[in-house]
Design a protein with these regions (language model features):
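Retroviral Gag capsid
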Residues: 1-94
Length: 94
């Protein structure tokens, strides 16, 4: 199973699909935290990787631990790359 890169496109569905593919891969290969985060961050490219590195640096400078839990990484990615109006539109549909 190939897991493709994520480079912060304008389409929020790209992130949702990317997360789903990674979760399928993690389950198939029986990969657990914190290796999930380390593998996922290698698949971030361009703006997404710059943002992730800056987030991790900011956390360290504020005395917090770097993110090492997959669920927290997913939350941060969604907050950054999925606009609230997209979430509201999905909520209205269902």
């Amino acid at each position: 199973m190939e897991v493709y890169n994520f480079s912060s496109t304008l389409n929020p569905k790209d992130l949702i699909d990317w997360i789903g593919k990674l979760e399928d891969y993690f389950e198939l290969e029986e990969i657990e935290d914190p290796l999930r985060v380390r593998l996922a961050q290698t698949k971030l490219k361009e703006h997404a990787t710059l943002w992730w590195k800056e987030l991790q640096i900011d956390r360290e400078e504020e005395g917090e631990l770097k993110i090492s839990r997959w669920r927290l990484m997913v939350t941060e990615l969604k907050e950054k790359f999925i606009p609230i109006d997209y979430v509201l539109e999905l909520f209205k549909r269902f």
